[in-house]
């Protein structure tokens, strides 16, 4: 009788060891801009799916460090970001590329004679220059 009780107690635990939890693997593909205001392009591999994310520090919060992540379900969605940046590069001041989850606005700083972009996600906001956009465009095209 003791053997049956022991078997019924051990078998469920032995069976659960066959089911391993596989956590998503995240790797940085490109560091667009380093600290203190980082922007990183990441690849997230979860079982059979590969998705991408743009991680950036929210510039609306100055009292602390808040990192926001803009997810892209697949490479095609990431290419839409590249197409939007390419179109805005050829555009004018105030042009906006609007998507379901985010928008990119082109702004120009007249004194510095440079082009800036404002990326607004679901909860965060970051700015980046044309040189950083070019780095992001060329890397996405190479994927």
What are the roles of these predicted feature ranges?
Residues 17-143:
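Positively charged, low-complexity terminal tracts
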Residues 4-13:
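Sec-dependent N-terminal signal peptides
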